[in-house]
């Protein structure tokens, strides 16, 4: 049975939401990105007026000011954006329960079974687009296709406020002429390798020798070749699908790149809080902690460590993850030798990071504690975590925060446990 997959992308999401609250700025260049005097201030999102001046996501605020002197900067309000994201999901839920968020502002929808009641994919996309404007005041670009890859490509094809089809009988005509970098999972590093092989377009990739691609790119070569040729059977995950719990983890792509060890520590603690809380909810402790790291060039690795004692304590899980990071990665900003070196350094600022606990035992599992561990201090940490759980359940996630989180409100503005979405580039889970 042929599938009908939509990919809905909220246009300039942060900026669009802010303009609803600042109507006086409509038609003027606006960017969301914090304090322009801040050391790490970057553009998180620019509206289309600012983009016409050359302002781009990820650009330093001072650079944005140079190319667009009249730009207005607004500080990010992640709680507001998450609320709008949830309202968008409520609209999508009227059409299907097969919804897979891809970050805060994008989602795949499998509407195959909705055709009888709601009409074909293009008609559903029109309805969703209309409702988003009327009910939320924002626009979306929607791709309509027979798989997730080309649905995503369709939503990127034309912006803003557009619907693009990439059906099975037209994807070669529409997609193959596009730059290969437009294909999901082709980052800068992969694009450079493909360019060195003479591959410029998605069509070039589709017509390439799969064996040669595997030789140059490993298994990713075969995956990208399949994507370019329209071979993607990956399902849109059913909402609230549950399976036997074998691991508990969270990952995120941060609003700006992580450039220092402290940046990484903040994000790891946020994610570890979610992992530990979910372990406690399910009555588990983990004996192994694993981290996954991806830098701005999309190079990635995973490392794991066995804990001395099984744990669902936030601090123990976070510190185990942080030690793994410190033992296996150095950021340029924290490397004194690198600062004085003129050579290219292999490791770059980080784009995303994840942490998970595996190898479970139940809360009732007995084990002998390490003789060097202070049982009273550990008991204190357990009680503190349990108290935080109770407070947050009653008054909300932001009712109690670690002091560490106040060092960078952009990086820390995330409720990983409640949000719990798949973030780019988390396509393969």
Give residue ranges: language-model regions:
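Non-catalytic surface loops within mature trypsin-like serine protease
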Residues: 34, 113, 146, 295, ...
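DNA-contacting surface of Y-family translesion DNA polymerases
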Residues: 7, 182, 190-347
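Short, hydrophobic beta-strand segments
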Residues: 107-113, 302-305, 367-373
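Acidic, metal-coordinating catalytic segment for phosphate/diphosphate chemistry
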Residues: 309-429
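Gly/Gly-Pro- and Ser/Thr-rich, intrinsically disordered tail segments characteristic of DNA damage-repair
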Residues: 1-229, 236-239, 277, 375-429
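A short glycine-rich, hydrophobically flanked beta-strand micro-motif that places a catalytic Asp/Glu
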Residues: 140, 144, 287-290, 353
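Short, charged/polar surface micro-motifs in flexible loops or helix N-caps
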Residues: 13, 36-39, 296-299, 360-363
